[in-house]
């Protein structure tokens, strides 16, 4: 074999090795970022909406997601529960919301965001879904966030924005366990969420923006 052929074969093997290393590193990365699975049996008695049902929930919690955020997602499910509402991939897929409800054709009816999304993400969701609900939390930081996005978000007619009360997310986070049995009662625009061993958390919110009639 001449020197030119030796060089070509060497480069070929280097590419193979690099490809193998890339595949191995990708698998290790996927393993490192693997979500933790939580299970929750949720009993809902919503007297405001006349909705009464039990739900068996499976929640994938991304390594970067806090207990507080995960439990706010569960609270959001309880507040807007329906037969078709479901958790998305969450932080594992930035193109999906925290929760959503689709019709039988796959069209998005309800898009629920938890946290403090920027105005571009909210606008994009507004164009994809019939209604968008943002549930912010964090007390004072939510107020600052809202002032930053308000001027643009208020133009979006199908968007609702709520802000949970100070300390609510932290109190919900304290309920987090890998396997949970939760009860949620909703009456007069207040929800109480608890388990069998602790006092229920009063979940109250301020309406930053209500949807307009379309």
Predicted regions and their residues:
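Glycine-rich, aromatic-bearing surface loops/beta-hairpins
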Residues: 180-214
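Short, Lys/Arg-enriched N-terminal segments with co-localized hydrophobic residues
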Residues: 16-30
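Short, hydrophobic/π-rich interface segment
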Residues: 147-184
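Acidic-basic catalytic patches of nuclease active cores, encompassing PD-(D/E)XK
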Residues: 46-91
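Long amphipathic N-terminal alpha/beta scaffold segment
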Residues: 85-104
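A short acidic, amphipathic alpha-helical/loop segment
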Residues: 121-125, 148
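Conserved catalytic cores of phosphodiester-cleaving nucleases, focusing on short active-site segments
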Residues: 99-101, 106-122
């Amino acid at each position: 074999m001449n020197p030119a052929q030796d060089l070509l074969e060497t480069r070929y093997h280097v590419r193979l090795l690099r490809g193998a290393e890339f595949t191995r590193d990708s698998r290790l990365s996927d393993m490192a970022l693997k979500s933790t699975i939580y299970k929750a049996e949720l009993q809902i008695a919503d007297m405001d909406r006349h909705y009464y049902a039990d739900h068996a929930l499976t929640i994938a919690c991304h390594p970067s997601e806090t207990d507080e955020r995960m439990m706010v997602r569960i609270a959001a499910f309880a507040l807007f529960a329906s037969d078709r509402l479901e958790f998305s991939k969450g932080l594992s897929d930035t193109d999906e919301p925290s929760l959503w409800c689709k019709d039988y054709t796959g069209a998005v009816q309800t898009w629920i965001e938890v946290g403090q999304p920027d105005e571009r993400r909210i606008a994009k969701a507004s164009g994809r879904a019939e209604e968008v609900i943002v549930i912010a939390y964090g007390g004072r930081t939510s107020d600052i966030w809202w002032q930053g996005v308000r001027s643009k978000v208020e133009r979006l007619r199908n968007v609702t924005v709520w802000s949970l009360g100070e300390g609510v997310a932290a109190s919900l986070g304290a309920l987090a366990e890998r396997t949970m049995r939760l009860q949620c009662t909703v009456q007069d625009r207040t929800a109480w969420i608890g388990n069998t061993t602790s006092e229920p958390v009063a979940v109250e919110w301020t309406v930053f923006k209500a949807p307009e009639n379309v």
